[in-house]
A protein has these predicted regions:
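Catalytic cores of nucleotide-sugar-dependent glycosyltransferases that transfer UDP/GDP/TDP-activated
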Residues: 1-554
Length: 554
């Protein structure tokens, strides 16, 4: 049977033109592949949360849909139209959702009456996300009624629980539009893991609703669960999260959509080599300016971890522990500069460090005070990374062969210290380490290998499981991806495995290193969107067929 294809896709996410986490990368890297298939008929909808400022990821085009925007304004919708500044430059609409807060209670009441969604226990970001979601759905409805008709095959695709209210609104008010929901991580699964509960050992004993009550997550659990129940096609990003959906949301997914990568982000060889040298030189300068130690390119390994600041879930704690153990391993053949590139409650760039870095040629032989972080933090005394480093005695003394630095900011090229984007820094690495305890997919290891940096991850990450499947066995660093076995309780073994892998890699000769880097690049090419986009069209087909059946009865 020939698959149905959408004429238009409206895709909403809090991270459209709003770089917060991994979902931004999912959508931004996939955009070009969809643009090539259906140019300017994939329309992304994101939050206009920049106020009077302009989003650095959005290029406004006031002429785009000018006639519709007048109608939208009459309907109380304040939108900006333009292009998302990513490869493919897809159409993007940013909507101001603040005007709907005054209608919040009426919106939630309708949600309860029609779909049984409990918003009474809402707190934190629930209201903000829900009002955006409502606004995004209203934008889609308005655009549809202005330009389209029931003859068009239209998809409304929401990402994460934050878009659930909008999906249910479309289901209610625009049933001729097919709906699709992707959970990139169940909110209750992430919460169980983040609250130091053993997610995996007792997995089949967990009841999602019961755990939501215990962890004060009732409203997020409710909107996510009911959206999964009513949507035309329910999807997630990995087999491990598909198990979560079935167990904690009581709804098996229809399709698994593994996250791909668009390697147009990766520079060509000559530019790549130039940027790699620049990145390493900058990292060495930063480390010298902080500690007074000097670093030789042939005798220094750069190792990093990155991601959102979830100490246990992202494995930041076990990364710190593994680097600490490395300090006492006499088999280590090189110096190690280890970086934790995780945004925290950053106050400002260290002025003493900035002053030193302004001298591009001077080599320093004395350390700065407390040379462990590149930026000042609010409430440094309660920061978990700094606290763990202090407890372990990791002070980056000048003569320590292993040094760990906390880079607590978004690497967007304007942090005040490194002033390079994440992609322009990561290619300076020798290894990347992502020892996640909870990781539905894991974009960071995929990004690493795409930039020819071998990585260490775990079999609790969707990407790690996928890599094992591709390789046919547990991956090794020689093959570009070392996949470490991780459970609820083997923290110490994981720390040892990471430390030992770094030691082993430090002994590689030039030929072995080149082979490992080549293998990393090769495995990344098996995860290109050109290979994975077929799963999306499978999901679109499922959703469209259900919508067509509804149209027959309208």
């Amino acid at each position: 049977m020939k698959r149905l294809r959408p004429d238009y896709i409206f895709e909403s996410s809090w991270e459209v033109c709003n770089k917060v986490g991994g979902i931004y990368t999912v959508l931004a890297s996939r955009a070009q592949t969809l643009q090539e298939t259906m140019p300017d008929r994939i329309i992304f909808i994101g939050p206009d949360c920049w106020g009077s400022k302009c989003s650095p990821y959005f290029i406004e085009d006031t002429s785009l849909f000018a006639d519709w925007k007048k109608k939208a304004a009459e309907e109380g919708l304040n939108v900006k139209t333009g292009r998302w500044e990513v490869p493919g430059r897809p159409v993007a609409i940013l909507v101001d959702f603040s005007v709907f807060y005054s209608k919040k209670n009426d919106i939630y009441a309708r949600l309860w009456e029609k779909y049984g969604v409990d918003s009474l226990h809402a707190y934190g970001d629930y209201d903000e996300a829900s009002m955006f979601s409502y606004a995004a759905a209203r934008v889609t409805e308005s655009y549809y009624r202005f330009y389209l008709s029931s003859d068009d095959n239209v998809i409304y695709h929401g990402n994460e629980w934050m878009t659930g209210l909008g999906i249910l609104y479309i289901n209610d008010r625009l049933p001729q539009v097919a709906t699709m929901f992707t959970t990139h991580a169940t909110s209750i699964g992430r919460s169980i893991a983040g609250n130091n509960k053993p997610l995996y050992e007792y997995f089949t004993g967990y009841n999602g609703d019961q755990m939501a009550q215990e962890l004060n997550m009732q409203s997020k659990q409710s909107i996510e669960k009911q959206t999964a129940m009513y949507v035309d096609c329910f999807t997630t990003v990995s087999d491990i999260t598909a198990r979560e959906c079935a167990q904690l949301l009581d709804k098996p997914v229809d399709v698994v959509l593994p996250n791909g990568f668009d390697n147009s982000f990766v520079p060509a060889k000559r530019e790549f080599d130039k940027k790699r040298k620049e990145a390493r030189k900058l990292i060495f300068r930063m480390a010298n300016a902080l500690t007074g130690d000097t670093f030789d390119d042939d005798d220094t390994m750069v190792v990093s971890t990155s991601g959102r600041y979830e100490m246990r879930n992202k494995g930041i704690d076990v990364f710190v522990e593994s680097i600490n153990r490395l300090r006492f391993n006499h088999d280590l053949k090189k110096k190690v500069i280890a970086l934790i590139e995780v945004p925290a409650w950053m106050k400002e760039a260290r002025t003493d460090l900035v002053e030193r870095l302004q001298s591009t040629t001077k080599v320093f032989d004395t350390p700065l005070p407390n040379p462990v972080a590149t930026h000042r933090l609010h409430e440094e005394g309660s920061d978990r990374v700094l606290g763990m480093m202090n407890w372990l005695g990791m002070r980056n003394d000048k003569y320590d062969r292993v040094k760990l630095f906390f880079v607590p900011c978004y690497l967007t090229g304007d942090d005040g210290v490194l002033n390079k984007s994440y992609y322009d820094l990561i290619l300076g690495n020798d290894l990347c380490v992502y020892p996640s305890y909870y990781e539905p997919w894991g974009y960071t290891p995929l990004e690493a290998v795409a930039f020819k940096v071998p990585c260490i991850t775990t079999d609790l990450a969707g990407f790690g499981l996928w890599a094992n499947t591709v390789l046919g066995h547990d991956g090794t660093v020689e093959e570009g991806v070392q996949v470490i076995h991780r459970t609820d309780t083997n923290y110490n073994e994981v720390a040892d495995d990471i430390s030992n892998t770094i030691v082993r890699y430090s002994s590689f000769d030039a030929k072995q290193t080149a082979a490992s880097r080549k293998a990393a690049e090769a495995i990344s090419k098996k995860a290109l969107w050109s290979h994975f986009i077929k799963y999306y069209f499978e999901a679109y087909d499922i959703a469209l067929r259900k919508a067509i059946e509804r149209k027959k009865n309208m």
